Amino acid sequence: MKEFIIKANKAVTNGEINLKDLPGSSGRLDLLCRCVNSAFFLSHDMRRDTIFYSVNYGSPNPPVALKFVGSELKRVSPDERSIALFIKKALEKDASELWKESTSGIYSSKREFRDIILEKKNEGKRIFYLHLNGKPLEDFEFKNQDDEDFLFVLGDHIGIGDEDEEFLEEIGAEKISLSPLELHADHCIILVHNILDRLK
């Protein structure tokens, strides 16, 4: 199982989303939509072995975590507007500590970025922090996905911040670099999928 989590520093935390202004008034929700696209959509299929989390820290009521489960997703199209509509529905729910399903395979909860990562760590998942200054990808050995589960941690255009970087170091997350160049989060997801696809 492959799981991804992004800290969305400015992404809105209620359903008041302007679909005509995802990058601006919605707090770079366009970035989040592109990550969902990269996490799940193939040319004529969807990835069922993937879960994607976004933890939104924008106004008015942060944090709100969103969870997308590939094996359950239905009716979502790959374009940003369609994905944003489903995110809007999820954010219209009153978030609590329990995951609430808004539409098939999409959930919201009142959870912190670190809490989800710790939960995955306690489940035995191997945690990777994708960062420009991490160890080169070729220095890591990945087992077959049937033998090992992964969580990949991503930052948005702002990053995750020093405190969360220290937290990841404390829990033993492995810092990995996919490229000598700084990449967009959605591009990183595609590269990770490509690497793990080749292990099947």
Curated annotation (Swiss-Prot):
Per the UniProt record, which EC number(s) apply here?
2.1.1.257
User: Where, if anywhere, are coiled coils annotated?
Assistant: none
One GO BP annotation is: tRNA methylation
A GO cellular component annotated for this chain's UniProt record is: cytoplasm
| A GO MF label | S-adenosylmethionine-dependent methyltransferase activity
- Per UniProt, S-adenosyl-L-methionine binds at 130, 155, 178-183, 188
What keywords does the record list, in alphabetical order?
A: Cytoplasm, Methyltransferase, S-adenosyl-L-methionine, Transferase, tRNA processing
Q: Which Pfam families does the entry mention? A: Methyltrn_RNA_2
**Keyword Ion transport, does the record have it?**
no
- UniProt xrefs under Gene3D superfamilies: 3.40.1280.10
Give the enzyme class.
Answer: transferase
Catalysed conversion reaction: pseudouridine(54) in tRNA + S-adenosyl-L-methionine = N(1)-methylpseudouridine(54) in tRNA + S-adenosyl-L-homocysteine + H(+)
Q: Does the keyword Transferase apply?
A: yes
Q: Where is the protein localized?
A: Cytoplasm
Indicate the quaternary assembly.
Answer: Homodimer.
Instruction: Describe the task this protein carries out.
Output: Specifically catalyzes the N1-methylation of pseudouridine at position 54 (Psi54) in tRNAs.
Q: Which family does it belong to?
A: Belongs to the methyltransferase superfamily. TrmY family.
Recorded protein name is tRNA (pseudouridine(54)-N(1))-methyltransferase
Query: What organism, scientifically named, is this protein from?
Result: Methanococcus maripaludis (strain DSM 14266 / JCM 13030 / NBRC 101832 / S2 / LL)
